[in-house]
């Protein structure tokens, strides 16, 4: 019976829903609240805390179709992708889970029923394995399911190491663990390979399709196994493998999804041979790259972003090997969204963003590839010997993004080789850096185990009576604290908000009859709330009655900033586009920090627009409403979920009028008007495709505006002062120039009726400078008449000077007025010195030329 991949996905979820399982959506490829994991790589990742007992949900049975990535960390399939039938960087894991509900019998029954009845697989093509000592599972398969004993294989420990077996699963060196049973499909004798547990088991005849893990024990540090009070079940079936069986093909790359992508890749590249392995690489990589970007990962040089960049560049390189010209990889996003069916809806919503990120990265790599080739050729030209060292190979790969296989190909063309061991050593160091990169902070759940649950009253109150249920000092549980002890205090109930969703934890004071504990921070520890701080006086013991009081002033500032982040998020989406999604936030009393997806710097005008919109919503004074509803109802209402957060089945939906509706478990103001004022203080990039805005609200916003105004006023005054000084210096230079020109004017003195006369036009000089020149010229000629004019900024300036021995014949005022009248002005002054102004600059030359005739009549 043929079934498409999408039909299998829907059939699986519907089957387990009919068995009382809650269908849970695939979680993000970026693990939520798990600092130990690079990418989600199994269906159970999102239920880890349920299996550990630190999280309780309103269901005990769940089923998922979980998207997974295995690349760049401990589970890394990247190097094998495209060259085997079943290795992928991206895959979907179908799973059903029981949290202390059903166990082996039902898990085995469900698996067998789905495979043989719903999918109609022939029972004689199925083979099962059990852990060597798991007689219970063997009996269920043999006696209840009717599987012949010769088709049930017991798998023991690897080389005798206790519990080191493919059929014994453990989360770590300690903690939940247990045996597992695996179901294999026999592709037939025409395919090489042996049964599980034989030397030929690595062949492709018998393929594992479903693994059922029975979490039955709690393993202690000394290796002893203690039965769990409520055993659980974790199962996983790769959708690509079961699709290959249902579609009658042997390789995963022959199923509908990959065949569609391979054909589309061949079309955009312009390549005809659909069997080429590079097309497989491209088809696989477009899935992991697209969904990593959907889940908030952007290409970068570290952590998750570095792994994404490696996958993109590997895909681009394989396209180039097939002759791809220009950018091609991003063109496969649309076909992928279509062929993924029900699992492609999120990708369709963000298709434009994914295409843009991939196109930019591909174009950048094209330039990097060219630089890398130039450096490689230079290194090979200067090589002493026949082996290119591993450090150079890694530098080309890591710094220039130059693929090692291409380095090897180029070297081989010159009959040279590369140091593969040295390269692998450097690569492993990089992989280790990638594993350790990211948000790998303190995991309090891994350090401290708390069985109790804290009831939170902080939505409605800032103080509460409580009892001390646990005390931890330096990670160890203690019965009492003494003054000066730093500790974590657990109460049965509390008004203190634990850090979550970007909102920092509350601070305050917890008092008991015999002491006072100052709380500096608050975190979630399982289902309890840990109050971090110091006992500043007295003693404090387990079971003490306490009064917990939150610092109200600090919290008030925090909630204003938190409410403002929701307005900011909505405003950014309105101004920049709906591709904007929150990638992180930090809400403190002092300010707020908001990280969001956007590929370029936000323009100044866009920031002003965002700021105006937020402040407009503040002035509208929307009531901030919080409603509790199930997750499906919240989505129907249009509520946005925040990046990296895990949500329970019942969620808090925060609404600010019709402007913003988001899921949020934080504490908020009563109305937007309480925020008062919003001011952005900075905007910048923190990673490829991720921008960060920092802002303040209320009094802090007013202070920021005043500080900006003071800074602007200071700069304005400094600029004005500098301009004034420059004007002064310019005038001094003009005066100096005019003074220098006055020396040359002596040569232009002429005589009229035996009297020395100087008439000249000196543009650019100020009137003050001209007066000085007239005085200087009078001294130089001893006896005579001087008439100077200038044009400055379109206006005419005139200065006339007459030595005292001649003022009986010619008065300076009469002379200057005669000239001024011709240039549209007038003036006056002493008989020996007079000045005037005018407006007709073009008439000045003729006006000065008339002086000679005027003086001739009077001398």
Swiss-Prot record:
Function: Catalyzes the attachment of alanine to tRNA(Ala) in a two-step reaction: alanine is first activated by ATP to form Ala-AMP and then transferred to the acceptor end of tRNA(Ala). Also edits incorrectly charged Ser-tRNA(Ala) and Gly-tRNA(Ala) via its editing domain.
Cofactor note: Binds 1 zinc ion per subunit.
GO BP terms in the entry: alanyl-tRNA aminoacylation; negative regulation of DNA-templated transcription
Assigned keywords, A-Z: Aminoacyl-tRNA synthetase, ATP-binding, Cytoplasm, Ligase, Metal-binding, Nucleotide-binding, Protein biosynthesis, RNA-binding, tRNA-binding, Zinc
NCBIfam families reported for this sequence: alaS
Main location: cytoplasm
InterPro entries according to UniProt: aa-tRNA-synth_II/BPL/LPL (IPR045864), Ala-tRNA-lgiase_IIc (IPR002318), Ala-tRNA-ligase_IIc_anticod-bd (IPR018162), Ala-tRNA-synth_IIc_core (IPR018165), Ala-tRNA-synth_IIc_N (IPR018164), Ala-tRNA_ligase (IPR050058), Ala_tRNA_ligase_euk/bac (IPR023033), DHHA1_dom (IPR003156)
UniProt-recorded Gene Ontology molecular function terms: alanine-tRNA ligase activity; aminoacyl-tRNA deacylase activity; ATP binding; tRNA binding; zinc ion binding
Protein name: Alanine--tRNA ligase
